[in-house]
Amino acid sequence: MTLRPLTLAVMAVLCAAPLDDVVARSAEAAPASSTPAEITIEPARFAPPPISAMPEEPASRLRPLITRYRADREALEHVRSLVDDGREPLYAPSRAQLRAGLVANWQARLAELDTNTLNQDDRLDRLLLQRELALDATAQTFGKERYEALRGLLPGYDDLVALLEARRDLRQADPRRTADVLERVRRDLEARASRLTAASGAPEVSPTLALRAAQHASALRRGLEDWHTYQSGYDPQFSWWVDAPYAALDKQLEAHGKLLRDTLGGAADPETLRADPIGDAAIAEALAAEGVDYSPAELMAAAEKELAWCQAEMDKAAREMGARDWREALERVKQHHVAPGEQPRLVVELADEAVHFLEARDLLTVPDGAKRDWRMTMLTPEYQLQAPFFLGGQDVWVAFPTDGMPHERKLNALRGNNRHFSRAVVHHELIPGHHLQHWYAQRHSTHRSSFDSPFWTEGWALYWELRLYDMGFAATPEDRVGMLFWRSHRAARILFSLGVQSGRMTPDEAVALLVDRVGHEPENAKAEVRRSIAGDYGPLYQVAYLVGGWQFRALHEERVTRGGWSEREFHDRVMREGSMPIRFLRERLFERVGGEAPGESWRFLDNPANASAR
């Protein structure tokens, strides 16, 4: 039996009832809370500790080099960016040459260092900077390969990019010659569109490639708009020669992008989910760069075992609730949501509850200033189409229905953000999760901020979901179901992310996986997949949650369970070391950072702490 028929049946019942009745029933069903007193805001919370109590930051010979490289790179990107909206996929030859030169020069500078004269922190920073340079070089190669694959769909691509790059070189456009270029590209695009739409002569164009080319066409339009505004009206000759050809080209580019996106890409409906898989080779390279010595097949097998473990645990909780199985238990839990307008109050309650739990067990240091130096923002209805739950970092963003949402969307949002689901993830977004990471990153090892890894960022927050579950943070069977729902979700993310990025699973199949095997609302599942493939996150970002959590669990077992460190010592040390791939962090915690990247394989899934994945 799948969850989809059950979900649709329940939704039909709920949608037939007034929303007030649904809220009233859920409020009656929700277990009472026994949260400790709310944390208060006092001026002393933001006072620094005495100098003698501040942990000493290790001096690093590499810190000035890292700072200089970061400044050089940011300057290059600032000057050579062709589209100033943060979403530019364009391949620009001159910029690529400058990037390659920057990487090569810095690699040469690092080679001048004698690793025998470096201490552990210096060696670590050197390896992290080396890794970042190598990743930059790999990204440049990958970008060029993708450009070569699509340039045939966008005739004149190189000519238009040359105009944009000339502006970055501070060269004024020659009006007459520029007009000729724009008109020639317009005619070539028109001819290419005719061939693409001709029934007899249409070449084989994959939807994936067509959609990628459509993104480039859109980026060219945005770049050219800024380029045109820069000179039009300020240079009479430019306006006289260029304005009309530019307007005609812009119209042609818009039509060409629509052809690529809607007709060849099959994405005329904005609700259509389309992915752009990176392929097996790129997946393997990305995992290797993170120090993950497992193949995609091995990770997917571990995710299947974790998912089965979660469902068995859910069945136990379901029996305690008097439910037939985990699906019925999950359906009951989804009814335990607060009334409209009450979610912000619940978030504060749950945030404080997590802090009290951590401090009562001396698990890590939660600085007073970190407990309330975050804001809360409600996600807009539009943003909830991609992020139907919580988001976090420096602050927390909360998903909950608004009065203007359609009735069914209101119910989806209420059910998906119920008390028990929320209790399982508020600490993920705030403390000890992302907000605490941000607090420490602003004050310790700040030069390592550019070495961020999603396996560290999301793995740390996910690790705490696993640890808190083991320590009994879920006080009721309903709370356990809430935590197990999200743990199942993380396992499913490995399955669908690796499946979609390899091209072996479609986005629609990913949605079905989340609905049928995890228990998501259909609309929430679609939003989760849309967010994963929209391009705002790296292709392995969703994989990083549970895999990073497994890595941290294994590292905890090595250093605390077997190594004799205290809980606080381990967790505080992780936070103070700063962001990096966990494989590198492991070397630092064992005081064995060498001159080269770690060579010994780390089979963290074999660690007894990860028995649920074996």
Name every feature range the model reports, one short phrase each:
Residues 2-3, 25:
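N-terminal acidic, proline/glycine-rich, low-complexity intrinsically disordered segments
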Residues 4-17:
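Gram-negative bacterial Sec-dependent N-terminal signal peptides
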Residues 20-23:
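Sec/Tat signal peptide C-region and signal peptidase I cleavage site
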Residues 25-614:
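N-terminal maturation segment of proteins
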